[in-house]
């Protein structure tokens, strides 16, 4: 009997890796410590539990890098994308999911797969060498014992930062005499209608008082080691954004553009708080961009000053959780193996990707790399022109820059990253209009994104088919 491939961690990356291995005909053993041992952020014991937002972000495969990543993962039989599509809830142009239904779908698919064994146990340190090929997908909440073991093996400390969790509100406690349903610019998306967000308007006086309250509100106190731990810019607590300047929020999560208040259509709101459906029943809505480290009592007091939320009942209040990630360009090779111990691969947020979809995507590739290795074959390198290739390239070497002082392979500061078009190689030729004239402004940006996504689809199809890739060397 062939040796199984072990996966440690049953989050999005680990679940996707196990699925890819099992679908490839190899046995996968998935180790998940919950419910035997919980974490600071998880609520239940299901696999692929979403601990922060319920949004997979934009599903636009022509104009958005994460939407392109969705499409690429679907083309590679992603379990995470299959479960997301089956459990989508309205969210404008985004793909958002019923978090419980999503986790249940992933859990059921893996529990029922004949090639998957799920062991509910903690792997406290490094896996034994007798396991052979192993994928560590322990996520941002990697246990201290395992984090210390990895640090001891690599000789480098893992880096850490915080993610903050947004509150969830009961729909029936929102005052619809002040709030209204509308997606920004009335944009419909997967499962959406163009009226998928609840909007709560503020005038200037209300907004300024709200910002002042956020800044003055009592915050969660840090342990000594946490005091110097930075935040990831893509998930800043709302009060930290407020501290960056009085206009920051109304140009960020509270921007009022593309929305019209039907209760007072002639008056433009100064700022708008949006809430997004959080479950299939539509009974729960999360506050978009309102991740916070305010104390719970302060959250209730301050958030009830938002028009429409004066009597809000909270199903969950916001909080903080620690996120640990590797200095991956130094520590991992091109197939996500640990250079110091090639039996071990890493996947998910611990590698320095950021976001649900990105974590699952890295898990997908880690699973395929491990499967190919177990079968005695080698996967052709992913085209860097694809979303998958750009993301893996960023993690395993895209952040390297030559330096006379530090050597040719010295990485500059490595930070967690969402997939974005800045990670893609530039186009050989910029888009032009029908007359051949070079474009400028929004039209140029839209056509450039379409050209990048068209190129990615062409190159991924060639990679899947084993064809020569004309753009891979750009």
From Swiss-Prot:
Catalytic activities: uridine(54) in tRNA + (6R)-5,10-methylene-5,6,7,8-tetrahydrofolate + NADH + H(+) = 5-methyluridine(54) in tRNA + (6S)-5,6,7,8-tetrahydrofolate + NAD(+); uridine(54) in tRNA + (6R)-5,10-methylene-5,6,7,8-tetrahydrofolate + NADPH + H(+) = 5-methyluridine(54) in tRNA + (6S)-5,6,7,8-tetrahydrofolate + NADP(+)
Subcellular location, record wording: Cytoplasm
EC annotation from Swiss-Prot or TrEMBL: 2.1.1.74
Keyword Methyltransferase found: yes
Disordered: annotated span: 425-451
Keyword DNA repair: no
One term of GO molecular function: tRNA (uracil(54)-C5)-methyltransferase activity, 5,10-methylenetetrahydrofolate-dependent
Cofactor(s) annotated in UniProt: FAD
Highest taxon listed in the record's lineage: Bacteria
Keywords of this entry: Cytoplasm, FAD, Flavoprotein, Methyltransferase, NAD, NADP, Transferase, tRNA processing
HAMAP family attached to this UniProt entry: TrmFO
Function noted in UniProt: Catalyzes the folate-dependent formation of 5-methyl-uridine at position 54 (M-5-U54) in all tRNAs.
Protein family per UniProt: Belongs to the MnmG family. TrmFO subfamily.
The name this protein goes by in its record: Methylenetetrahydrofolate--tRNA-(uracil-5-)-methyltransferase TrmFO
This protein's encoding gene: trmFO
